[in-house]
Amino acid sequence: MRPSGRKTDQMRKVSFERNFSKHAEGSCLVKFGDTHVLCTASLEEKTPPWLRNTGKGWVTAEYGMLPRATGERMKREAAAGKQGGRTQEIQRLIGRSLRAVVDLQALGEKQITLDCDVIQADGGTRTASITGGWIALYDCLKWMESRNMIKVDRVLKDHVAAISCGVFANQAVIDLDYLEDSSAETDANFVMTGAGGIVEIQGTAEGTPFSEEEFSSLMRLAKNGIGELVALQKQAIAG
């Protein structure tokens, strides 16, 4: 039995609140149960130096957690003068995941930065950031389209979403909350497109290596879960 009472293949309640920020070109407050992340997409009329005069744009991401997003207050990384390794890893993952479904040539020489700020953390912050970040990116591109800068269907090739899966109490489960994640035998994150293409898989065994059969079980859970998330994304942007 999972601590939350959920079935092994049952995700937490997921919601998207679009246009949460009045200033950003695109924004979304995404909630995976008690994990809440504010994703904003900001358009800049510039590209990284290595892309200048290439006609290509760029999509990148930054990630952070508010000091009291967790059970005990964390010091702001800015106060320490540098980002931690976990933060850098997660924001690179978010950027890679979103770029996987963007035609950078069709975007033109512009940069879109996704800022994913965790308001409340209860496991799965990186997967929530990717899934909600796609909504914010979509709305940013719609903003650009409304000003005749691009055509969304030429720039955005597909949906992308992410979910965590793991082995908890000898069972393959989906969408781990913090309690499960902190004591899981295996923890994995899956990033996939709406068409089912795999963008990235991160998997780690805690103590006991996991088997190919267990990995296949996690993969099946993730594929079904991401299908549900993509359906929710479609529902959100249609509203």
Swiss-Prot record:
PROSITE patterns: RIBONUCLEASE_PH. It comes from the Bacteria. Signal peptide: none annotated. Phosphate binds at residues 86, 124-126. Its EC number is 2.7.7.56. The keyword RNA-binding applies. The keyword Nucleotidyltransferase applies. GO terms for molecular function: 3'-5'-RNA exonuclease activity; tRNA binding; tRNA nucleotidyltransferase activity. It catalyses: tRNA(n+1) + phosphate = tRNA(n) + a ribonucleoside 5'-diphosphate. InterPro entries: ExoRNase_PH_dom1, ExoRNase_PH_dom2, ExoRNase_PH_dom2_sf, PNPase/RNase_PH_dom_sf, Ribosomal_Su5_D2-typ_SF, RNase_PH, RNase_PH_bac-type, RNase_PH_CS. Pfam families: RNase_PH (PF01138), RNase_PH_C (PF03725). GO terms for biological process: rRNA catabolic process; rRNA processing; tRNA processing. It is an enzyme of class 2 (transferase). Keywords: Nucleotidyltransferase, RNA-binding, rRNA processing, Transferase, tRNA processing, tRNA-binding. Homohexameric ring arranged as a trimer of dimers. HAMAP family: RNase_PH. Phosphorolytic 3'-5' exoribonuclease that plays an important role in tRNA 3'-end maturation. Removes nucleotide residues following the 3'-CCA terminus of tRNAs; can also add nucleotides to the ends of RNA molecules by using nucleoside diphosphates as substrates, but this may not be physiologically important. Probably plays a role in initiation of 16S rRNA degradation (leading to ribosome degradation) during starvation. Belongs to the RNase PH family. This is Ribonuclease PH. It comes from Rhizobium etli (strain ATCC 51251 / DSM 11541 / JCM 21823 / NBRC 15573 / CFN 42).
